[in-house]
Curated annotation (Swiss-Prot):
It is found in: Membrane. Its main location: membrane. It comes from Arabidopsis thaliana. The keyword Signal does not apply. The chain crosses the membrane at residues 5-25, 41-61, 77-97, 105-125, 143-163, 183-203, 206-226, 246-266, 279-299, 305-325. Belongs to the drug/metabolite transporter (DMT) superfamily. Plant drug/metabolite exporter (P-DME) (TC 2.A.7.4) family. GO terms for molecular function: transmembrane transporter activity. It holds the Pfam family EamA. This is WAT1-related protein At4g16620. GO terms for cellular component: membrane. The lineage of its organism: Eukaryota, Viridiplantae, Streptophyta, Embryophyta, Tracheophyta. Keywords: Membrane, Repeat, Transmembrane, Transmembrane helix. Residues 30-154, 206-324 form the EamA domain. It is a multi-pass membrane protein. The keyword Transmembrane applies.
Length: 359
């Protein structure tokens, strides 16, 4: 029994690390596709519908008994909002931001999610904050560090890219050249992470009423794909392939299936791990994708990073772990308090003064 549990623990750790490496490779491939001029919304549409086709049979086999007989109107509204924020808004802005920056920057930004989720949940009244509690203060400090690190990394990364591309222009020491396109890309990424964080908070509310994460992902992906198609028609009036002919429709469909497998499989595995071990351990592995992307970009794309970029990245990772550490400690403290309250309630019931003592 102990050996089986050890193997499961090792499988979880190896699976989480492997998922981040695959995610990093997928991000690098995405960056290459975007550099060819392929429309980001087209990639979102193809990958989303591919995910629906691949994940729906799995949801039917594993979670059919968990489906409710009917969905309430409130639950339907939440599902639509998650589809808009987590699929159309997040993926569209994320790919647009990656197009203007790099895969390394795009994989670094999602590390802001725990801090943003904390702020959104606090504003919505779902997260308790006591200024007298040390863990609450650590979470607030970690959130500030995350945001500061993201801003520093964005500014330094945009400056580095510009200076390395204008070697013939003499650089004045007191003047800093900033690539406005990179700054715009970072803003797209920040907005994308805000959308993702909002959708995660909503998902927690949905799963309390609809405890089938794979089925929820399938439904949200379908609705998100439909809304993205509607957005494509609203913005461009048609489903134009753009520069997709450069690589061929067959290769693009093949990537869509690969992207659907990566996103659908990764999210399903994360949902299983969260159910067994909680969300904290999943978040702890998220910086691996950023590190892999930085290394791959440095060797394959000759992308330069200065000390300021790494300092901002380190600051953001530090803030992330502060938030996760405080959240984990706070959850443990709440569990201990609940156990203590249960024990006190049991004692009061057992030694009720209105009951005669046993002789």
């Amino acid at each position: 029994m102990m050996k089986r549990e050890t193997l499961i623990e090792a499988g979880i750790i190896g699976g989480l690390a492997g998922a981040q490496v695959i995610y990093a490779g997928n991000s690098e491939l995405l960056s290459q596709l975007l550099s060819l001029g392929i429309d980001p919304l087209l990639i979102v549409i193809l990958c989303t519908f591919a995910s629906v086709l691949l994940i729906t049979p799995l949801a039917f086999l594993l979670e059919r008994k968990l489906w409710p007989r009917s969905l309430s109107f409130k639950l339907k509204i939440k599902l639509v909002l998650v589809a808009l924020a987590g699929v159309t808004l997040f993926q569209g802005l994320f790919l647009e931001g990656m197009k203007h920056t790099s895969a390394s920057m795009a994989t670094a930004m999602p590390n802001l999610c725990p801090a943003f989720i904390f702020v959104i949940a606090w504003a919505a009244g779902m997260e308790k904050v006591k200024l007298s509690c040390m863990y609450s203060r650590v979470k607030m400090g970690g959130t500030v560090l995350c945001v500061m690190g993201a801003l520093i990394m964005s500014l330094m990364h945009s400056t580095t890219a510009t200076l390395s591309s204008v070697k013939t222009i003499p650089i004045v020491p007191d003047e800093v050249v900033v690539d406005k396109d990179k700054i715009l890309g970072c803003l797209y990424l920040l907005l994308a992470i805000c959308g993702l964080s909002s959708s995660i908070v909503l998902q927690a509310s949905i799963l309390a009423e609809f405890p089938a994460p794979i089925s929820m992902f399938s439904m949200v992906s379908l609705m998100g794909g439909i809304t993205t198609v509607a957005l494509q028609y609203a913005l461009k009036g048609s489903m134009e392939m753009g520069s997709a002919s450069v690589i061929g429709l067959g290769h693009l469909v093949g990537y869509a299936i690969l992207g659907g497998l990566v996103s659908g499989g990764g999210l399903s595995f994360n949902a299983w791990v969260i159910k067994r071990k909680g969300p904290v351990i999943v978040s702890l592995f998220s910086p691996i994708a950023t590190v892999v992307c930085v290394v791959v970009s440095a060797f394959t794309m000759e992308e330069s990073f200065n000390l300021g970029s790494f300092a901002g990245m380190a600051l953001m990772f530090g803030g992330l772990y502060f938030v996760l550490w405080a959240k984990g400690k706070e959850d443990c403290e709440e569990i201990d308090e609940m156990k203590q309250d249960d024990e006190e309630s049991l004692l009061r019931t057992e030694f009720d003064l209105q009951k005669p003592l046993l002789l």
